[in-house]
């Protein structure tokens, strides 16, 4: 068993760098970073500062602070270390705690009448986590890479919505995604398949929820179902 737990890569500096990358680009930070980018680099920067601070405060509390605190308490109560949650069977409770926080975040944003293209970021992340929980029954997807895929999908979706060229940002975040995926493999937290699978889940969820074309297709499909139901009755 001791041989199986050893790192294949023995370079301690490389392992420390991989750990630092994993901590910096934690999945918890993805929604907050997405909102921050929107408020700084898109036309949403013209919104009142007070409004932006309220939205960022809500997102921070429910997507970073609450999940981090509840998972920390869960670890302390059960005597788990940070690495113990890498085991597939121990990931369900952290997932459920995070999903609960995101649901409360959506409810709060709904009460504040925040536009759909903002709440859609949280909704896409929520769907992504639910899929990860289901897949986790048999396989361990990388949540870090799911978050990276969601960011890239969100960039494509918002570029279509707001009409800007996303190539520069896409190059940056694709590079970050590659570094992050490599770090997860170096730390032996995931295989290449789990890294690629997580990225695909995040990318698809983000595009389906946020991209205007997908929303148009869903709307047309709903109209088709309504018309078909009317004719049948």
Residue ranges with predicted function:
Residues 1-17:
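Short, Lys/Arg-rich, polar N-terminal cytosolic tail immediately upstream
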Residues 21-41:
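The first (N-terminal) embedded transmembrane alpha-helix
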Residues 42-50, 80-83, 111, 215-225:
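Membrane-interface helix termini and inter-helical loops of multi-pass transporters
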Residues 48-64, 88-89:
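Loop-to-helix transition at the N-terminal end of transmembrane alpha-helices
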Residues 81-97:
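Juxtamembrane helix-capping/reentrant segments at transmembrane boundaries
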Residues 97-106, 147-152:
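Core segments of transmembrane alpha-helices
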Residues 115-225:
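Membrane-embedded catalytic cores of phosphoryl/pyrophosphoryl-handling enzymes
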Residues 230-233:
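Conserved small/polar residues in nucleotide/adenosyl-binding loops
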